[in-house]
Regions:
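Flexible "arm" and connector segments at domain edges
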Residues: 2-153
Length: 153
């Protein structure tokens, strides 16, 4: 079957590249069509921010937090990825680098807490309560991790 990967013998996958030819100009039109106005138009973006600020959100700080948590989390993951898949060693230097990146993540987490007017204790307590409901016996369960009850985010 085209596209199957042979994981034995380190052979290249048997892929017929013509099976999945895409008209990139049509794809670009599709992507543009399913993109919200605030994502592609500056004035709509500003109006969206103004509307959210008018609703009482601290959107500028939330946006800072969201972008920062994602970026710094990616840097943390990059170190782990290189250790697991690219031969980077587990050593004091890499451990310290992970701690530094984790500190950067926490800085942005605190930005989010400040934007939401909550404490880190509130976040942790809420997380513990959520997980107690998901795992009432106090132990991980694969089924419950994949099959959530209604309202379990």
């Amino acid at each position: 079957m085209s596209g199957d990967y042979n994981t034995h013998n380190n052979q290249q996958p048997n892929i017929n590249y013509t099976d999945h030819t895409v008209d990139l100009s049509k794809y670009a039109l599709f992507v543009d069509g399913v993109t919200s106005d605030p994502s592609k138009d500056y004035q709509s973006f500003v109006e969206s921010l103004d509307e959210l600020a008018g609703q009482g959100s601290n959107i500028h700080r939330l946006l800072t937090a969201a972008v920062g948590v994602s970026a710094e989390g990616g840097e943390f993951m990059e170190i782990v990825k290189k250790m697991v898949f690219q031969g980077k060693p587990w050593d004091d230097h890499n451990r310290k680098h992970l701690v530094i990146e984790l500190g950067d993540v926490m800085w942005y987490v605190m930005q989010a807490c400040m934007a939401l007017n909550i404490t880190l204790d509130d976040v942790i307590a809420g997380n513990v309560e959520k997980l107690k409901k998901r795992y009432p016996g106090g132990e991980f369960d694969v089924y419950k991790s994949e099959n959530r009850l209604e309202g379990d985010l």
